[in-house]
């Protein structure tokens, strides 16, 4: 007798459940997505003990016909695709027909459903076995309850985390679904306590406000663009609002939340040097495209996708964000803390946001910032930044970045009056004149410059300011076509491992494009006899070593990245440090040079250069206005 045999359906469902149903959050995701596919406009999610004890989903969707109820719990039974061609034109969130049988095989499940034009159906299933089926009176829609999850798979139950952790996983999934489908009203309850309620009016900014707080919603920048193949819409926060994790960025593809690292990377690249190292924005990006251009059938939970025109999409995202930030004022306001009024009951408010009006009715032409493209430009005269001082060896003393307090979904509502304080996002061209004239007042601790104008008080980090000036100078100088070189008094020898040597050898021609000429010296060494004149004096070998590390790490020469990193490194080393006192003339010259830069708001590492206190804020602090 042969050893290989076909598994029965119940065992097959248990095995499939291992992939589809990892934890309570998986059940919530699959059932809520089924409700959305059934054209529901209102969905309630009730949890007990983070879903381990009970999960109940109530919707007002199309419901399931009596003759389909049993079939729906069979493996690979679905109403969403019919043939292989449909697999490449998927518009629904589900399509495999795996979720319901997998969930039913590891739980006690009760289903009450009706299509509205016939009596409803009541179905009870335990561990995959049908216990009861009968007709019942029911409104249109579906009410499905999952209890005692993993009761028959104790090994899986043993690896569940704490109630708090599992609840966090569920709320994260529900938040993403709420952002993906703002046209659906979602209510989330845990142990009869309301955690989330979205209005379902289609305004995603209201959803973002209810999830991330009204304070974050006030600092959202609308993003919108369209190409031949893609349409993107969404919101991202101003650079001053960041988090320590990428988890606050959500990417939606054709209504489906997906985890895609390259999309998140494109959002970060759109900020370019506006973000501090290790900090990430809060963002929501919805992408619509022809289903033929995306493969959603590559992950058990359908959380990952593959794009057939990925590079075009990434470029569109980067350029759209860069164009958006060119048009808004990026000087962070210090703000005034006001006491929040209390409310008596928790309710989802109708938020009214005044969106910044675009200058043109159509989308502006998207252009990469000057100096950031790959094209080599003809050499031109570049003004050397004013050398106001000798760099100090003392490090900058920086204050830690303060995390903005997130809104607790359990807190009692919002005040509509807060909406009147929504910061106006002014769309102005970033052309070097964005920064208004500043008049120096003085200096504090040899580190911060105080200046004023008719709009209030400005505090400037002098190191960050000159770092931005130097960065734009070096960025323009690095990689010019007509390279001026300077001979080294003593040739510099670079010793590498065999693997490193081979990687560098492949990129010799590319390195020449940034002015670095290497000659082979022995089996695993190179020598450098000259270097570009823009290398800061005394730092030549250090910069060469940095470039070699980049080539070895990347396994290729990324000219744009080399230029960027070299310019950033040199600008930091050549800039003033903390505890260096300046004369009034030096301060004035620094501020005037800062005004000529293309981005006077952040240093190349993304830290803010200046902070603004408006006259109104100062008067409020001193109780001159109430």
Curated annotation (Swiss-Prot):
Biased composition, class Polar residues, residue ranges: 383-393
One protein family per Pfam: DNA_mis_repair
One Gene Ontology molecular-function label: ATP-dependent DNA damage sensor activity
Coiled-coil zones: none
Keyword line: DNA damage, DNA repair
GO CC terms, sorted: mismatch repair complex
HAMAP family: DNA_mis_repair (MF_00149)
PANTHER family for the chain: DNA MISMATCH REPAIR PROTEIN MLH, PMS, MUTL, DNA MISMATCH REPAIR PROTEIN MLH1
Family: Belongs to the DNA mismatch repair MutL/HexB family.
Protein name per UniProt: DNA mismatch repair protein MutL
Species per Swiss-Prot/TrEMBL record: Bacillus anthracis
């Amino acid at each position: 007798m042969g050893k290989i045999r076909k598994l029965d359906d119940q065992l097959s469902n248990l095995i499939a459940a291992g992939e589809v149903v990892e934890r309570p959050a998986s059940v919530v995701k699959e059932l809520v997505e089924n409700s959305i596919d059934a054209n529901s406009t209102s969905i309630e999610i009730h949890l007990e003990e983070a879903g381990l004890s009970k999960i109940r989903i109530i919707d007002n969707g199309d419901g399931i016909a009596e003759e389909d109820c049993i079939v729906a719990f069979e493996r690979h039974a679905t109403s969403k695709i019919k043939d292989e061609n449909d697999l490449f034109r998927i518009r629904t969130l589900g399509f495999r027909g795996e979720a319901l049988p997998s969930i039913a095989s590891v739980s006690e499940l009760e289903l009450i459903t009706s299509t509205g034009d016939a009596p409803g159906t009541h179905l009870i299933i335990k561990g995959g076995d049908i216990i009861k089926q009968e007709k019942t009176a029911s409104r249109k829609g579906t009410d499905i309850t999952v209890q005692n999850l993993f009761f028959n798979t104790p090994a899986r139950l043993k690896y569940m985390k704490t109630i708090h952790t599992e609840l966090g996983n569920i709320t994260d999934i529900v938040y993403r679904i709420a952002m993906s489908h703002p046209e659906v009203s979602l209510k989330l309850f845990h142990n009869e306590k309301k955690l989330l309620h979205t209005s379902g009016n289609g305004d995603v900014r209201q959803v973002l406000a209810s999830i991330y707080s009204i304070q974050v919603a006030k600092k959202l920048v609308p993003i919108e663009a369209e190409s031949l193949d893609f349409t993107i819409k969404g919101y991202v926060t101003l650079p001053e609002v960041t988090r320590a994790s990428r988890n606050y960025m959500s990417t939606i593809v054709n209504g489906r939340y997906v985890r895609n690292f390259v999309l998140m990377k494109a959002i970060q690249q759109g900020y370019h040097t506006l973000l501090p190292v290790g900090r990430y924005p809060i963002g929501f990006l919805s992408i619509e495209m022809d289903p033929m251009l995306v493969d959603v059938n590559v992950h058990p939970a359908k959380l990952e996708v593959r794009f057939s025109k990925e590079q075009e999409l990434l470029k569109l995202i980067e350029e759209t964000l860069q164009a958006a930030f060119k048009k808004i004022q990026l000087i962070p306001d210090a703000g005034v803390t006001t006491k929040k009024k209390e409310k008596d009951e928790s309710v989802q408010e109708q938020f009214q946001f005044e969106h910044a009006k675009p200058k043109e009715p159509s989308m502006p032409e998207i252009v990469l910032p000057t100096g950031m493209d790959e094209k080599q430009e003809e050499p031109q005269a570049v003004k050397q930044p004013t050398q106001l001082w000798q760099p100090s060896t003392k490090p900058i003393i920086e204050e830690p970045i303060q995390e903005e307090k997130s809104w607790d979904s359990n807190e009692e509502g919002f005040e509509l009056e807060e909406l009147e304080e929504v910061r106006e996002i002014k769309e102005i061209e970033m052309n070097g004149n964005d920064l208004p004239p500043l008049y120096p007042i003085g200096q504090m601790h040899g580190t911060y410059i105080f200046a004023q104008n008719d709009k209030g008080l400005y505090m400037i980090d002098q190191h960050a300011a000159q770092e931005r000036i130097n960065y734009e100078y070096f960025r323009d100088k690095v990689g010019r076509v007509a390279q001026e070189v300077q001979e080294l008094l003593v040739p510099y020898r670079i010793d590498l491992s065999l693997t490193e040597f081979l990687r560098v050898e492949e990129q010799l021609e590319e390195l020449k494009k940034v002015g670095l000429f290497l000659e082979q010296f022995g089996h695993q060494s190179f020598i450098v006899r000259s270097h570009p004149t823009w290398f800061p004096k005394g730092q030549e070998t250090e910069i060469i070593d940095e470039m070699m590390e980049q080539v070895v790490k990347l396994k290729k020469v990324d000219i744009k990245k080399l230029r960027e990193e070299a310019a950033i490194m040199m600008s930091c080393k050549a800039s003033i440090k903390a505890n260096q006192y300046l004369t009034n003339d030096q301060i004035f010259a620094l501020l005037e040079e800062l005004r000529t830069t293309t981005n006077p708001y952040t240093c190349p590492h993304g830290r803010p250069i200046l902070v603004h206190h408006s006259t109104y804020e100062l008067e409020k602090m001193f109780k001159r206005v109430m």
